[in-house]
């Protein structure tokens, strides 16, 4: 399901979904290597914009926008988890290296799935209930401190 991380080769095209402060710090380090860095972000004045080799203004949660941006990259990564996972899955199936893997992003984006993953893999986490209905709230209300 999840591939091992492969090296990013010199001359590669690296795309980043999200152009905030973390992306800016990433670019400031990555710029020392022979990679072409592109950023997709909805804000024209995103912190990454002045540092990237190319900047595309657009929505990173829109399938068509992410797909069009990603098909020109060798490697895609994220700066924010609120991205279109379906587009990343398609790009991965077409040979684009996507990190983190879209399957991992699905878990990270859904905090309920994330908590279930922790529990299934014995990763310490705070106690939790998955609440899907009013009845669930009524059933678990006595277990909450307030």
Label each PLM-derived region with a short phrase.
Residues 1-104, 108-109, 113, 135:
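ATP-binding N-terminal substructure of ATP-dependent carboxylate-amine bond-forming enzymes
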């Amino acid at each position: 399901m999840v591939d091992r991380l492969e090296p990013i080769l010199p001359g590669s095209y690296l795309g980043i979904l999200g152009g905030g402060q973390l992306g800016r710090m990433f670019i400031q380090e990555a710029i020392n290597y022979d990679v072409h860095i592109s950023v997709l972000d909805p804000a024209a004045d995103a912190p990454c914009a002045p540092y990237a080799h190319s900047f595309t203004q657009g929505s990173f949660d829109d399938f068509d926008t992410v797909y069009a941006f990603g098909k020109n990259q060798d490697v895609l990564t994220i700066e924010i988890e609120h991205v279109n996972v379906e587009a990343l899955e398609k790009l991965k199936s077409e040979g684009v290296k996507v990190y983190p893997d879209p399957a991992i992003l699905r878990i990270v984006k859904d905090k309920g799935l994330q908590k279930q993953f922790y529990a299934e893999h014995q990763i310490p986490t705070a106690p939790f209930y998955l609440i899907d209905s009013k009845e669930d709230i009524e059933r678990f209300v006595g277990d909450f401190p307030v």
